[in-house]
């Protein structure tokens, strides 16, 4: 019986190992790291099978080892499913998600009744069509923008004449300007305007006019386009914010967009958005209707699909040892330097050099601000059904890149988070997401001190 079972495991493992090899090395449709767990597991089974038939004296022990390994992984899968049973098998999870969705829609509808310009902020890049002649790269202008809820309330702010999170009077001021360039952390997602980084700087320093160019979901190519399109007069400095959580991922996606690609490749390319801001506004509002339809349709589809397919999904997940694979890959990744982001890092540096040259030609100074992500400080680094880990290797490479290009660095990880007893206090309810109001102001203080 042992021999028959072991032989069956051997044949199955051999076939699956060949399948993994084909998918990773020949078809190249899967990253090697994603299937590393299966490589190891199937190789172990094959290895112990040969020991089983070669050293009969200890064959029973080899059999027990393999069964113990497979049994341990299976028990872990069952434990994981049990610990998340509310999400998988009960309606309470879906009802919670439904309440979140309905809460946001109710907030939007109430604001819409009071202010017809109300609109839920989104990144227009995600709805870009190949035949689209104009791509908005900021939000709707002079509008009541509604964002997210991480701290117990939905944040909102009034956009300026170009679709940024500023008081419109900023464009009339004759003071020297400092531009804040970045993604949702700069834009001020999930907090109201008085509590974002830009507002904090304005409270602390009346010498400069601080202008917020933050756009959610943007990386450096998008941000370079913002500078080229909306460069104002009398700019002294640029605070360029790098968020380690997703900037390298998003810059690769931006280069796939033909219009952003033109910004990168052609120094003279422009959509003349300052002059065409009304047209940009029209496109943004038209696409917003599609965005609202997708919000509703995706929620209903996802909810119905998950409820009807949970049992089959869980069974397949256990069979594939999905969570065991994620755990092993995560543990191995901490001990291994990975270079899979080298393309993104090189692309980021190429764009950074272009940004630096552009800024210096305008007689301004570029200052690089490093923003850390939640998983850097999360002890377990496991949330949203996946393992996450900040990449210390990328951290070093980014800093080497910035130093090589002679750009001043402000490291918020070192200057703020490492000085806190519990860095997770910077995140609302200590959950993954954006920073809270207090830490946004702490960052404003650090940036202001760098100016003095």
Language-model features, listed with the residues they occupy:
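Histidine-centered active-site loop/cap adjacent to the catalytic His
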Residues: 1-6, 428-452
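Membrane-interfacial loop-to-transmembrane alpha-helix junctions, especially the N-terminal start
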Residues: 2-12, 58-63
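Membrane-embedded alpha-helical segments of integral membrane proteins
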Residues: 8-51
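Serine-dependent acyl-ester chemistry module
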Residues: 11-27, 243-399, 407, 412-418
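Internal/C-terminal transmembrane anchor helices
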Residues: 57-80
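Hydrophobic alpha-helical transmembrane segments in integral membrane proteins
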Residues: 74-94
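Membrane/wall-proximal cationic-aromatic binding patches
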Residues: 87-204, 416-430
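Conserved SGNH/GDSL esterase-like catalytic core that processes O-acyl groups on lipids
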Residues: 156, 177-179, 187-270
